[in-house]
Amino acid sequence: VHFVASANTTEGTDFPLRDVNEQADSWLDATVDNSQHFSYLAQQFAMQLRAAHPNVPVGIIQTAWGGTPIRNHVKGGSIYANHIAPLEGFHVAGVLWYQGCNDSANEATALTYESQMTSLINQYRAVFDQNDLPFLYVQLARWPGYQYTQNVRFAQLSTLSNVGLHNASNVAMTVSLDTDKGTSTLIHPLGKDILGARMAAQYLAMSEGKAVPNGPLIAYAKHASDGTIILSFQKGTATGLQAEKPNYSKTASTTVPNYTANSDATPLDGIANVATPTSASLQGFEIADDSGKWA
């Protein structure tokens, strides 16, 4: 696994390298020493791909810039201008996207997030000249610090079916609601290993022409006579749905399975027991109406 990471600057028109890449004048190996400069989510994603295809090298071009609104990442935005536009003509295998917290801070940006996200997917695919380029993104974690987080989360879900997408194939959202291992009060919760595994499973399914894994998707809801709401899910998206009890004592893995040496290792080794089965029945779901207001 190798990576190139961009510097957080909008000066100039050339792709701005971080000092570690600038000094090396090359791709950097994803070693322990270099990992501090490299997205942990991307590391976990790459690890899963290596597990599935140990003889295929993985290269990550990292353009992440924390605390920035999505408008800076689309055409006309300051980050797009020297982080994305210079990559036009490159061949890439896909895009990983985890952003939206900044846009959750005020109502105006939250309410325009879906249209911005839809444009971003179309534009990035155009840059790399592939209208079905795999685009994988994470739905925001449930951090309660910003008032409009739920609106952005709903916008991210709605993007999947937005009619403005030039091509809806190979677009997948990874749910993070159940992955934080009890750290939902942190703006950067645990669980990137789980997210990386889920995104890799989606990408591998896309590349192999198989059904892409996703979370349950509601088709419709109706009121029952007893005052409850009955939810119906889209066919095939809620098979085997069951209640589980979160393991709040589970911490991030300190070791990584050696997939090359151990053929029995699986991509989910090291992140098992995040939740355990329970005899409890499902009690309810968090739902929102078309305006993004949550019930």
Which residues are covered by each model-predicted region?
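Cell-envelope and extracellular/periplasmic
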Residues: V1-A295
